[in-house]
């Protein structure tokens, strides 16, 4: 299946009322389901809604996704992202470092969701994410 076809399927899955548009509420619900602060929906609409009608059409959604760098470039840059989160340079990301990174990125995720996410992705159960665990999450999320 082509990447664009996958994106279209995701769009339709988020579009709960099947009206062909993503509303703030639909985007916020989707974000909440994956553990991201629903307020990020406002930022997504602001950056994606080209005709300023307060909702995102399939065309606007696909155009925004087409502007993203190719997947290979994205994966190659994840090490830089990991290192920017790993403030103490330990080679591991603590829950505190992750929380600080998310807050400075405008994502205020509740502590319970953050702990649950960390528990799910901390495969060796040492309380921190190493780069391999981080990359495994990225690869699973951005297949």
Curated annotation (Swiss-Prot):
UniProt-annotated binding residues for Ca(2+) 3: 86, 88, 90, 92, 97
Residues annotated for Ca(2+) 1 binding in this entry: 15, 17, 19, 26
Top-level taxon of origin: Eukaryota
Assigned keywords, A-Z: Calcium, Metal-binding, Repeat
Pfam families in the record: EF-hand_7
GO molecular function annotations of the record: calcium ion binding
Domain EF-hand: 2-37, 41-71, 73-108, 109-143
Entries under InterPro entries matching the protein: Ca-bind_SignalingProt (IPR051581), EF-hand-dom_pair (IPR011992), EF_Hand_1_Ca_BS (IPR018247), EF_hand_dom (IPR002048)
Protein name per UniProt: 16 kDa calcium-binding protein
Provenance organism: Schistosoma mansoni
